[in-house]
């Protein structure tokens, strides 16, 4: 797929075999012209550039963008082989609070620019991710005891609350210990420490392609001046075509 930006092009390759739902949907939208004249509406330096909001077509300079959709989502298609190194294409989505299944937006996507990380930084990130997983287990257990917690709070039973907290924390640790710990692969460590990326997104957003030509176009968009909503002040349109079907 080719993306034009003021007559400058980049070439994107889909991961056809591994992410078929995202592949088929992306091709469908490109063929239907859904992306034509849409904007790169969200740009964050050392992170990513985002596009695909249908509402960005002919949008005013003050319009708040990023909420447009095509009326459906796509089930997540996570694959450990594909991670958020610089240049990959991934599906945007709503947050975990309203989207615990991590389903992808039906149309919005982003291209990672990211930054480089040292190995100690990546190790610290691994630890943080594992801590967050344990916290999520604790929160899930706590929700199962909400009535009990409410009664204790109403009665001012602080000792009972602390005892229950200790019990739930122990249960969460036990459950976490049974799960495989998150670890970056040697390939991820090499990529994130040399070309860079956004490792904190791994396993949470579906990666389904990458830029194979014209990364300088992405780099130029990334450094564009933006407003307080991260929207570029200078307009960058997208125009996607299908000159060639790529396969891996």
Task: Outline where the language-model segments fall.
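Single conserved hydrophobic/aromatic residue that forms the stacking wall/gate
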Residues: 1-8, 12, 239-248
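A generic structural micro-feature
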Residues: 2, 81-83, 101-103, 201, ...
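Short glycine- and Lys/Arg-enriched binding-loop motifs that mark or flank ligand-binding interfaces
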Residues: 4, 48, 67, 83, ...
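Internal glycine-rich, Lys/Arg-flanked active-site/core loops of soluble domains
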Residues: 13-97, 102, 107, 111-112
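N-terminal targeting pre-sequences for secretion and organelle import
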Residues: 116-240
């Amino acid at each position: 797929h080719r993306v034009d930006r003021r007559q400058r092009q980049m070439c994107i390759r889909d991961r056809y075999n591994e992410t078929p739902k995202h592949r088929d949907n992306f091709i469908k939208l490109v063929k239907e012209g859904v992306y034509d004249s849409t904007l790169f509406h969200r740009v964050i330096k050392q992170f990513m550039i985002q596009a695909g909001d249908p509402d960005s077509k002919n949008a005013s300079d003050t319009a708040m963008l990023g909420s447009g959709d095509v009326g459906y989502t796509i089930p997540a298609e996570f694959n450990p082989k594909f991670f958020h190194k610089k240049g990959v294409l991934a599906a945007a989505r709503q947050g975990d609070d309203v989207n615990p299944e991590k389903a992808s937006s039906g149309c919005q996507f982003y291209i990672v620019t990211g930054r480089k990380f040292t190995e100690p930084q990546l190790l610290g990130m691994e630890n943080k991710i594992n801590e967050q997983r344990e916290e999520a287990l604790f929160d899930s257990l706590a929700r199962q005891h909400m009535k009990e917690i409410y009664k204790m709070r109403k009665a001012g039973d602080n000792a009972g609350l602390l005892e229950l907290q200790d019990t739930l924390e122990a249960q969460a640790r036990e459950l976490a210990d049974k799960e495989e710990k998150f670890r970056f692969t040697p390939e991820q460590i090499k990529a994130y420490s040399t070309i860079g990326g956004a490792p904190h997104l791994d396993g949470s957003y579906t990666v389904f392609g990458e830029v194979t030509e014209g990364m300088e176009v992405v780099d130029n968009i990334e450094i564009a001046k933006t407003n307080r909503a991260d929207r570029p002040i200078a307009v960058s349109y997208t125009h996607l075509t299908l000159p060639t079907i790529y396969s891996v």
